[in-house]
């Protein structure tokens, strides 16, 4: 039987559902609405395997903050009622047949990326449910990203229209432009238009930096900030080699599974 693994970026989904509520303290409503959302996702995607991946909620900002100390500094914490309700949300999802994977020190993004790539590399179909465009660097013939809330696929045509680069160049793109929401600065003075121009001429940051053909208007910026660009690229790239400690069979989904 053909495999279709659906990976839910859990907090990405929960936060969006919760933020649309008139009463942020009504976690019972959050549970109900996320269950409805997941039921629609299951109905539309027909998974054979499914899992929800949650970020760890400790104070440790992980390996990216070691490379770039300002990474995700100053982000608003999760609302306390929602934080206190996460276990109930996970229980409600478990009753639907969806297990939760909680990261321990790693960001959920890296766990999602590792699991998705391991399965896709064997030629099996993987769908990541998330609005996070960072996952687009993983795109492959059997790995796709679905923005459920905008009802769109974050596919290669979307990336070309949105950023003007190839999926495999996205970490270089963000190494140049930065990611403001994560406090990733990039090279000062290089924005999306310049990054698109550079990456249409060169494969990546290193090739551009080493080339005598790099336009003069960018040479000084590269010479002054190349190490920063390298660090920003590293934190923008997703890890795909985390030890998972379980196998795909553990994630098998059965519709209307009795729990």
Curated annotation (Swiss-Prot):
Sorted UniProt keywords: DNA-binding, Endonuclease, Hydrolase, Magnesium, Metal-binding, Nuclease, Potassium
Residues that, per the record, bind K(+): 176, 187, 190
Documented EC number(s): 3.1.-.-
Binding positions (Mg(2+)): 109
Sequence segments annotated as region (Interaction with DNA): 189-194
The organism's place on the tree of life at top rank: Bacteria
Requisite cofactors: Mg(2+); K(+)
Residues in 5'-3' exonuclease domain copies: 165-255
Note describing how the cofactor binds: Binds 2 Mg(2+) per subunit. Only one magnesium ion has a direct interaction with the protein, the other interactions are indirect. Binds 1 K(+) per subunit. The potassium ion strongly increases the affinity for DNA.
GO biological process annotation, one example: DNA replication, Okazaki fragment processing
GO molecular function, one term: 5'-flap endonuclease activity
SMART domains xrefs: 53EXOc, HhH2
Family matches, as InterPro entries: 5-3_exonucl_a-hlix_arch_N, 5-3_exonuclease, 5-3_exonuclease_C_sf, DNA_polI_H3TH, FEN, HhH2, PIN-like_dom_sf, Xni
Family matches, as NCBIfam families: PRK09482.1 (NF007017)
Role description: Has flap endonuclease activity. During DNA replication, flap endonucleases cleave the 5'-overhanging flap structure that is generated by displacement synthesis when DNA polymerase encounters the 5'-end of a downstream Okazaki fragment.
Family per similarity comment: Belongs to the Xni family.
Protein name: Flap endonuclease Xni
Organism: Vibrio vulnificus (strain CMCP6)
